[in-house]
């Protein structure tokens, strides 16, 4: 029999909160104090509740975010979403690890396709204090 990671309700609450405008107080209650976020906006992870909240709220204020599905595995949960700003859209996944208290301890975020992901990062970089990227292609 397959067992699943506990506290799926935390991830479902996270998704509901993001759909509701990323309320800071609600999110604070489900993020661990030392939460780490690995994401597509920067090469370096964001560490700590306040830094992660700032990034989440910046993205939530600027983009149309729609979560499609929450998946649960043996040790992690994942939330599949679509993120859009103007004519730039990416499909993505939040890969979430919860601590023993059921709080979000680690989030890794992936976006695709790459060209749209780079364009999305350029839309959001200034909002969260990151350097905008540029996609360079090699032609022969």
Task: Name each model-derived stretch.
Residues 1-140:
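C-terminal and inter-domain tail/linker signature
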């Amino acid at each position: 029999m397959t067992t699943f990671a506990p506290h799926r309700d935390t991830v479902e609450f996270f998704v509901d909160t993001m759909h509701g405008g990323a309320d800071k107080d609600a999110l604070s209650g489900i993020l661990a104090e030392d939460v780490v976020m690995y994401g597509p906006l920067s090469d370096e992870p964001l560490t700590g509740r306040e830094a992660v909240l700032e990034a989440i709220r910046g993205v939530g204020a600027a983009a149309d975010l729609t979560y499609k599905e929450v998946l649960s595995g043996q040790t992690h949960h994942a939330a599949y979403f679509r993120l859009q700003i103007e004519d730039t859209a990416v499909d993505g996944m939040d890969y979430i690890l919860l601590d023993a208290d059921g709080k979000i301890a680690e989030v890794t975020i992936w976006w695709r396709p790459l060209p749209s992901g780079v364009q999305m990062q350029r839309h959001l970089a200034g909002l969260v204090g990151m350097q905008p990227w540029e996609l360079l292609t090699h032609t022969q």
